[in-house]
């Protein structure tokens, strides 16, 4: 698997703004994209149906999602500011990658991306 994730700056701004608006609750969105030679390229952000946003958690019923092989991962927020995935994050992640954004949601410095094993990947914002 690639160790690099490529994300347009507009998409990162959208994820950060959504997290900021829901703060102090956690936000969650799906990441659509594709695996390419140079890395995993995220092309779109989707709001999962029937998502729940709470203090210390966010979730959605996976069985309510249509079959979509373009989902490469999930992005969610940590209102605490921590950018490290919890055991729960790793166990409940969907797809190949997990993007975590943390308070104060100001920019790339408040975002980290991981694979399903919790290993840090390179986040390239273009």
Where are these regions (language model features)?
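Conserved beta-strand-loop surface patch within small alpha/beta domains used
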Residues: 1-71, 79-126
């Amino acid at each position: 698997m690639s160790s690099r994730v490529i994300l347009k700056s507009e998409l990162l701004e959208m994820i950060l703004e959504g997290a900021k608006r829901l703060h102090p609750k956690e936000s969650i969105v799906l990441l659509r994209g594709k695996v390419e030679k140079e890395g995993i390229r995220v092309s779109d952000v989707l709001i999962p149906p029937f998502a729940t946003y709470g203090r210390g958690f966010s979730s959605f019923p996976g069985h309510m999602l249509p079959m979509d092989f373009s989902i490469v991962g999930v992005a969610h927020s940590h209102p605490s500011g921590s950018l490290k995935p919890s055991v729960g994050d790793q166990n409940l992640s969907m797809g190949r990658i997990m993007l975590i954004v943390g308070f104060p949601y100001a920019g790339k410095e408040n975002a980290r991306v991981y694979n399903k094993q919790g290993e840090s990947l390179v986040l390239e914002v273009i």
